[in-house]
Amino acid sequence: MSTIKSGDIDKGSFLLFKGMPHIVLEREFSKMGRGGSIVRLKLKNLKNKSVIKETLKGSDTVEEIEVLEVNSQYLYKDNESLIFMDLETYDQFSVNLRDVVNLEDKVLFLQEAEVYSLIKWGNEVIDLKLPPKVAFEVVDAEIAVKGDTVTNAMKNVTLHTDLVVKAPLFINIGDKILVNSETKEYAERVKV
């Protein structure tokens, strides 16, 4: 593990803070009078999922966690676990939904046979990176009523992973759409 000055911490950094692994959710740098500076951090504990806010001096140091990014193929969901395959060794392994921060929110974006980046600390999976936009097929869509032409009229559509998002009225069953994985909002229709 290496130490890093608080002024060099970025959003998404992995830190060992008070003996526990954390991910930086937000970072705000403020320059004070007479050359001093402070860094305000919003940290999420990767073990118990608690969120804390910390204020550090610009000269303070914290331990940065050495993490490994591993590409793995998602195979299927089994009760409370997700089954992946390591693309180098072809070994299958499971990741418990409760062991990874925000994994329950990301499950609806996972598609079988797709490759995802898993963040490992030692032998433990601590995070899953999704692509910024994910393509889905629409399996159910509300019927658009004639006259619903107010600007930005939206309707609920259900995607093949059971994720429900708001989409424009012209989206129909069978269409493929891109969804922003961070905001869970419709991004665009996939052109065929």
Curated annotation (Swiss-Prot):
Keyword Cell membrane: no
InterPro entries: Elong-fact-P_C, NA-bd_OB-fold, Rib_uL2_dom2, Transl_elong_fac_P/YeiP, Transl_elong_KOW-like, Transl_elong_P/YeiP_cen, Transl_elongation_fac_P, Translation_prot_SH3-like_sf
Pfam families: EFP, EFP_N, Elong-fact-P_C
Pathway(s) this gene product operates in, as recorded in its UniProt entry: Protein biosynthesis; polypeptide chain elongation
Localization annotation: Cytoplasm
Alphabetical UniProt keywords: Cytoplasm, Elongation factor, Protein biosynthesis
UniProt GO MF annotations: translation elongation factor activity
Keyword Cytoplasm among UniProt keywords: yes
HAMAP family, per database record: EF_P
NCBIfam families: efp (TIGR00038), PRK00529.1 (NF001810)
Known function: Involved in peptide bond synthesis. Stimulates efficient translation and peptide-bond synthesis on native or reconstituted 70S ribosomes in vitro. Probably functions indirectly by altering the affinity of the ribosome for aminoacyl-tRNA, thus increasing their reactivity as acceptors for peptidyl transferase.
Protein name: Elongation factor P
Species of provenance: Borrelia recurrentis (strain A1)
